[in-house]
Amino acid sequence: MSRPSSTGPSANKPCSKQPPPQPQHTPSPAAPPAAATISAAGPGSSAVPAAAAVISGPGGGGGAGPVSPQHHELTSLFECPVCFDYVLPPILQCQAGHLVCNQCRQKLSCCPTCRGALTPSIRNLAMEKVASAVLFPCKYATTGCSLTLHHTEKPEHEDICEYRPYSCPCPGASCKWQGSLEAVMSHLMHAHKSITTLQGEDIVFLATDINLPGAVDWVMMQSCFGHHFMLVLEKQEKYEGHQQFFAIVLLIGTRKQAENFAYRLELNGNRRRLTWEATPRSIHDGVAAAIMNSDCLVFDTAIAHLFADNGNLGINVTISTCCP
């Protein structure tokens, strides 16, 4: 989608660096879109999958599909006796030849199998060669991922796997919750009750007290097309001495689902307009990377004041579906 035109961005409710006040709803006129006023807030093992190893040449890519008992037996040789994840290169053994993964090894004083010494470190080069010829299951196979991967590709895939647990998407709240996609909205409604939800494809996101000092987040939910979208406006000092606002829309859903939608943010007033149109990001991706790359609506405090009214900034938010 396009970058902001000579019109502008839009934003919403804080979940940030001070205790969040209750959102106030701005009375809407008869026909216009819904509007919510959001007050600024203050600062704010997975089990090893059923084995699905496939023999491949060294460095050979991933795959998916049924696996033989022999493959299961082979990959089971790499299971860590402590966490039951796989022991991947560099592979270290105790003096008796037992394996333990590098993460668990750092927490142990002796071998969990024979109680022998773990030092000095002894590389098991033979097992490393075998590991390079095997495809390992993704650690999230138990929740639906069917990929098997070379050990060099496994960590990177698992960092972005669609089947990994979802984290709380509320920015600035330092919430450590994790769970399934189906449980995200329930978590937000019970643990973050100050977040307002508005219904409809077109709403007005009214962020209040935008002149608050320091880093502040405004967050609001928008419900339409059978999905929930999270509207986020962040104010932060990305560059020293230069505060900026970043506005973005996230889908409470997968990356594939997000591709079915587009959003438009618009600042409008005083015979000026600033717009941004893009595809929403999945909450699996979060907002940090988008802000780092300025892949969202970005404007500084001077621009914000052109559209603000007594320290309050209204952003028009429109969600639409994309043609297949």
From Swiss-Prot:
Zn(2+) 1 binds at C138, C145, H157, C161. Changing S28A: Strongly reduced phosphorylation by DYRK2. Residues 17-32 have a biased composition (Pro residues). A zinc finger (RING-type) spans 80-115. Phosphorylated at Ser-28 by MAPK14, which mediates the degradation by the proteasome of EGLN3. Phosphorylated at Ser-28 by DYRK2; this increases the ubiquitin ligase activity and promotes degradation of EGLN3. Pathway: Protein modification; protein ubiquitination. The RING-type zinc finger domain is essential for ubiquitin ligase activity. PROSITE patterns: ZF_RING_2, ZF_SIAH. InterPro entries: 7-in-absentia-prot_TRAF-dom, SINA-like_animal, Sina-like_RING, TRAF-like, Znf_RING, Znf_RING/FYVE/PHD, Znf_SIAH. This is E3 ubiquitin-protein ligase SIAH2. Its EC number is 2.3.2.27. The modification Phosphoserine is found at S6, S16, S28, S68. E3 ubiquitin-protein ligase that mediates ubiquitination and subsequent proteasomal degradation of target proteins. E3 ubiquitin ligases accept ubiquitin from an E2 ubiquitin-conjugating enzyme in the form of a thioester and then directly transfers the ubiquitin to targeted substrates. Mediates E3 ubiquitin ligase activity either through direct binding to substrates or by functioning as the essential RING domain subunit of larger E3 complexes. Residues 1-15 have a biased composition (Polar residues). The modification Phosphothreonine is found at T26, T119. Widely expressed at low level. GO terms for molecular function: transcription corepressor activity; ubiquitin conjugating enzyme binding; ubiquitin protein ligase activity; ubiquitin-protein transferase activity; zinc ion binding. SUPFAM superfamilies: RING/U-box, TRAF domain-like. Residues 1-42 are annotated as: Disordered. One of its GO terms (cellular component) is intracellular membrane-bounded organelle. Its main location: cytoplasm. GO terms for biological process: amyloid fibril formation; apoptotic process; canonical Wnt signaling pathway; negative regulation of apoptotic process; negative regulation of canonical Wnt signaling pathway; negative regulation of extrinsic apoptotic signaling pathway; proteasome-mediated ubiquitin-dependent protein catabolic process; protein ubiquitination. It catalyses: S-ubiquitinyl-[E2 ubiquitin-conjugating enzyme]-L-cysteine + [acceptor protein]-L-lysine = [E2 ubiquitin-conjugating enzyme]-L-cysteine + N(6)-ubiquitinyl-[acceptor protein]-L-lysine. The keyword Aminoacyl-tRNA synthetase does not apply. Belongs to the SINA (Seven in absentia) family. Residues 130-322 are annotated as: SBD.
